[in-house]
Amino acid sequence: MGCVFCKKLEPVATAKEDAGLEGDFRSYGAADHYGPDPTKARPASSFAHIPNYSNFSSQAINPGFLDSGTIRGVSGIGVTLFIALYDYEARTEDDLTFTKGEKFHILNNTEGDWWEARSLSSGKTGCIPSNYVAPVDSIQAEEWYFGKIGRKDAERQLLSPGNPQGAFLIRESETTKGAYSLSIRDWDQTRGDHVKHYKIRKLDMGGYYITTRVQFNSVQELVQHYMEVNDGLCNLLIAPCTIMKPQTLGLAKDAWEISRSSITLERRLGTGCFGDVWLGTWNGSTKVAVKTLKPGTMSPKAFLEEAQVMKLLRHDKLVQLYAVVSEEPIYIVTEFMCHGSLLDFLKNPEGQDLRLPQLVDMAAQVAEGMAYMERMNYIHRDLRAANILVGERLACKIADFGLARLIKDDEYNPCQGSKFPIKWTAPEAALFGRFTIKSDVWSFGILLTELITKGRIPYPGMNKREVLEQVEQGYHMPCPPGCPASLYEAMEQTWRLDPEERPTFEYLQSFLEDYFTSAEPQYQPGDQT
């Protein structure tokens, strides 16, 4: 028999839903999460290309740095001489080992994330990760060029430890095509450490300027000038912002469905209802996280179909799916995040010391990842702190997206299951199986309470049945201790009973990113008197 709160479970899974798009699904609360390990990791570049979900074979994946320096194949048109931005150690016999500054001729760039190249220094030929190189003498090859990152992400990186006053970066303009923005770390007695932003405008006849008094032929010339004199800026440009080596896009060329023997499970990081999470090594070379699923947890065929969609979802705030072992027991191989789940992190001493600005920033990162999923018409279905992972510099990434509807266990059925995460689930999803991006918005509001309370279970003192009965009548959790009224108001907006009245993730991202700066100008004037 079903529980009292399961009034009507509507039909589940249509052809559209099987593709991972919005629809009515059963969900589950993935208890699998793992704990800390002192391993450094940096988020990969943002993936801007929107896939065609109905045609996996035709995907063209565009590395994050590519813009005006993009090569257009090896027919002699475009740039073919590239330079390494980072060191790289070969992972397979087909890879090239190389060091930062090494130059290559690109022989074949038609297969997405991994290019065939010949090293000019060693003469060897092999595969290289495309996001580890840039065209020689291009702006993308400069250490201070960070490409397509937003204002808030620039602030996160510049304010991270190791950057002095005057640390800077150049990024693409968020509003003007072909223009750039300069972000500089500054300090004063009133605000302490903070970041100021300047627009780098482009002249119609070519050239760039911040103030019309001084114009330059290139961005490189502009940077060199302001490293010598501040000329109206808040500070001299002292040094490029520190950068950690990015994740490669995938483990290696053609490393998607991998053999079980290529994975070494080294240490169990966590145990959940349907399997374990391990720290592992792929091919004896690459540290990864491995989720091992108990046989019968989900259909291998259904999992592989969903994984084909999941691997195309690439964003800085989503945990990258590297590879799968598709025969039971299923292995899901992802990038490793050194601090484990957000839920565990909030409860440890470092998490307990976090202050409101840091907590709001972590929420903004989750909202950014969900805004990407919103644009891609993809639903998470189990958004909560246990399914957010934390890396270096308080980087937050969304994990376990898309897996919820594949679980076959009735205990994760909202009608029958004691394990179903009622306290995070929107009423229309819990009562009728209507999972949409708007039910994810509801869950995000609950996640906000987890952040503010440093990992407290939602609706303290109430059981699941009481929660659903009360929520259906319009009950909201009261404002958590220490939570500003304006932030609680945003939570309440996510808990509106009518899903269409809930805000978008795009709005929530903007609200949270600007939460402490909405009264200040985002960019400094170029011409100052």
UniProtKB/Swiss-Prot annotation:
State its Enzyme Commission number(s).
2.7.10.2
Q: In which tissues is it expressed?
A: Detected in neutrophils, monocytes and natural killer cells (at protein level). Detected in monocytes and large lymphocytes.
Record-annotated SH3 domain positions: 77-138
Q: Which residues bind ATP?
A: 269-277, 291
Q: What is this protein called?
A: Tyrosine-protein kinase Fgr
Encoding gene per record: FGR
Q: Which organism is it from?
A: Homo sapiens
List residues with covalent lipid attachment of type N-myristoyl glycine. Answer: 2
Q: How is it modified after translation?
A: Ubiquitinated. Becomes ubiquitinated in response to ITGB2 signaling; this does not lead to degradation.
Please, one GO biological process term?
A: positive regulation of cell migration
